[in-house]
């Protein structure tokens, strides 16, 4: 969505909160948070819109607002309007919606724009797309001469229509290339600042950074990207160590040993989505009888 934190209607937000909170003291406290304003260059600006992005409570209030403005409406639309299967996934103000039928996708998109407009929200024009995606997308697009299925980005990953080694359809998740470049750029700048620290201290910091990166990105089908990321980190570390001394004694053999001592190796840490879902929904059969899915992406 486009600038949802800044456009939230505060009157609607209070009404949503009053639906579940009966204690007027809590409501008044939240109203004070909303009216606290934002300080920029010494000037306090108070607005009757938005939740003040950056505030501790802003993400919570925005999530409550979107729950009533979008989530409940989407569930009701699926129950009453959809002619096929519909999948809705939202994280903060980013969401994707999957449809069995293209006609449902187009109707949902048009009606969702009207729904959001009622609550002072709108879709981001550059990030909102309607694409053909799923197990039959490649075959159908090839028949129409349209090339490979489009990809989409969600929560730091690029989702791709792929195949297993056995030739079966598989949704592949890869770390977004631009996000990885940005992370490596941050590491490079920080290593420059830490150039003259002892090697163990540098290694400890890099260990935490790489471990944290793997904790999020170590999903199935993303293993190669993890190896590439680790290789780039090793190279950045080697370049840093070479710059701090005129006598270049940092060979790749020694660098490899340092990396093995300090940097975690790439390992897939997260289960397949279908396996995770089956734990909480044991009677669910992944992809059972489901045709291809088209996605409306935000």
Predicted regions and their residues:
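Non-catalytic terminal/accessory segments
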Residues: 1-298
């Amino acid at each position: 969505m486009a600038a949802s934190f800044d456009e939230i209607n505060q009157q609607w937000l209070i009404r949503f909160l009053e639906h579940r909170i009966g204690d007027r003291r809590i409501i008044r406290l939240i109203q004070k948070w909303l009216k606290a304003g934002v300080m920029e260059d010494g000037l306090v600006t108070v607005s009757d819109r938005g939740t003040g992005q950056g505030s501790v409570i802003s993400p919570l209030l925005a999530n409550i607002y979107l729950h009533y403005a979008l989530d409940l409406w989407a569930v009701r639309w699926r129950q009453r309007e959809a002619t096929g299967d519909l999948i809705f996934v939202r994280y903060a103000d980013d969401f994707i919606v999957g449809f069995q039928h293209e006609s449902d996708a187009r109707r949902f998109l048009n009606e969702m724009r009207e729904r959001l407009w009622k609550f002072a929200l709108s879709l981001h024009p550059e990030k909102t797309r309607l694409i053909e995606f799923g197990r039959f997308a490649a075959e159908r697009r090839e028949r129409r001469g349209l090339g490979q299925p489009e990809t989409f980005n969600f929560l730091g990953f690029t989702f791709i229509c792929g195949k297993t080694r056995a030739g079966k359809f598989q949704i592949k998740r890869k770390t977004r290339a631009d996000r990885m470049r940005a992370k490596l750029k941050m590491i490079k700048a920080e290593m420059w600042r830490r150039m003259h620290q002892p090697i163990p201290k540098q290694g400890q910091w890099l260990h935490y950074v790489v471990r944290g990166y793997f904790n999020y990105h170590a999903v199935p089908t993303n293993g190669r990207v993890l190896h590439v990321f680790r290789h780039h980190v090793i190279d950045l570390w080697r370049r840093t160590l070479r710059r701090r001394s005129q006598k270049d004694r940092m060979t790749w053999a020694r660098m490899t040993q340092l990396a093995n001592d300090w940097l975690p190796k790439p390992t897939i840490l997260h289960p397949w989505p279908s396996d995770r879902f089956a734990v909480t929904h044991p009677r669910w059969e992944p992809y059972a009888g489901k045709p291809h899915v088209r996605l409306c992406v935000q």
